[in-house]
Amino acid sequence: MDKLTVQDLSPEEKKVLVRVDFNVPMQDGKILDDIRIRSAMPTINYLLKKHAAVILMSHLGRPKGQGFQEEYSLQPVVDVLEGYLGHHVPLAPDCVGEVARQAVAQLSPGRVLLLENLRFHIGEEHPEKDPTFAAELSSYGDFYVNDAFGTSHRKHASVYVVPQAFPGRAAAGLLMEKELEFLGRHLLTSPKRPFTAILGGAKISSKIGVIEALLNQVDYLLLAGGMGFTFLQALGKSLGNSLVEKSALDLARNVLKIAKSRNVTIVLPSDVKAAENLQSKEYSVISIDQGIPPHLQGFDIGPRTTEEFIRIINQSATVFWNGPVGVYEVPPFDSGSIAIANALGNHPSAVTVVGGGDAAAVVALAGCSTKVSHVSTGGGASLEFLEQGFLPGTEVLSPSKS
């Protein structure tokens, strides 16, 4: 890796400012899934073993820089964090100002402090509107560590401006290092072949950049979900009432043309599970060549498509998956996505990478999160990294000394 990592630092008895991603899903004040907190623990524990004073900063939700709002407080995160660490973690009532400065000053080596939600201040998402915000955060630490991959595609103060105040002292955390290793080396730089990408979700337009980038890398591109229907419509198929992004039909045709010129095999659904609506108790398995009747719409890939996708996965040496292939939240339209999750989890030898977001939720639902090689903690960030080859938040980290 060409960036400084946390293991290159000498943080003993020093204050280390760590940007983590504790933007966890919440409902009624309770955390629904703490994977993002767990994912940050290796870096936190590493720094504590080095007897560093660890200052954690994160955002939660979208309070839009309008000051403290209890529903966006990081207090629920503290309770989970204390459970993992086994000791008290103070929450500074703010991330800047006198109360924050005092909390930082009182922090002893071997202890952890969590600053309150960064996005309570306009200067986090809009650094140009309040340059003093990043400047004050920068004053807290001797070193800076970015372990928030899922936020590093944004040019926000804590991931883009603050690290620039730490020349030679801004490092990637262990989670960030793992993300860059899997997405960079295993997918972009030297993927084992055959390399297969599976893309689902609703829209082509939101993923056209990553599709075009993957056409330079992959041997097989499997397309399903709403995106798959748009490609099928571009080929003149009758899709009934299925979700089609009509404004993206020319994009789809162009992708098919590029794929052909680059010897990339694009595989589209050959059959689907179709129903009148998601509340229907009954569905029909319909061949795409036969055409979906006007009153029905496709909500999942059919058994023949599932079998074909799994066959290609099984013969691949590298697989990347982003976006479900059906409406996985509503059984029985979850079976295609669950089958893909199981195929990835049970593959005996392939490097299998899941690109965050809904695909990560499906893999968790299938009980395969620990069976795949890597589940990215950033949906949008993982796609942008694959498209650009870098992220704003990683570009500003210090270069490796080796």
Swiss-Prot record:
Keywords: ATP-binding, Cytoplasm, Glycolysis, Kinase, Nucleotide-binding, Transferase. One of its GO terms (molecular function) is ADP binding. It comes from the Bacteria. Its EC number is 2.7.2.3. Transmembrane segments: none annotated. GO terms for cellular component: cytosol. Pfam families: PGK. SUPFAM superfamilies: Phosphoglycerate kinase. Substrate binds at D21, F22, N23, R36, H59, L60, G61, R62, R119, R154. The keyword Transferase applies. ATP binds at K207, G298, E329, G356, G357, D358, A359. Belongs to the phosphoglycerate kinase family. This is Phosphoglycerate kinase. The gene is pgk.
